[in-house]
Amino acid sequence: YEEMVEFMEKNLLSVAYKIISSIEQKEESRICEGILRLLDSHLIPSSTAAESKSAQDIAAAELAPTHPIRDSTLIMQLLR
């Protein structure tokens, strides 16, 4: 009986962890998409330096959309 209770507790904790992780990932994804939309709609079109636009084009073409370096590359080029 004790083993069954322990197994059920571990199973419930595992399920709860998976649910919470999924919720956090969805929230992070939504926030990142909002930031990328802001970059695409306001900051990138208004940048005047050719290097910033060139870096954005290269990052968009060569890096996967979920690649963490892509976001930091865009932000660093816009801040210059």
Curated annotation (Swiss-Prot):
InterPro entries: 14-3-3_dom_sf, 14-3-3_domain. Signal peptide: none annotated. SMART domains: 14_3_3. Belongs to the 14-3-3 family. This is 14-3-3-like protein 1.
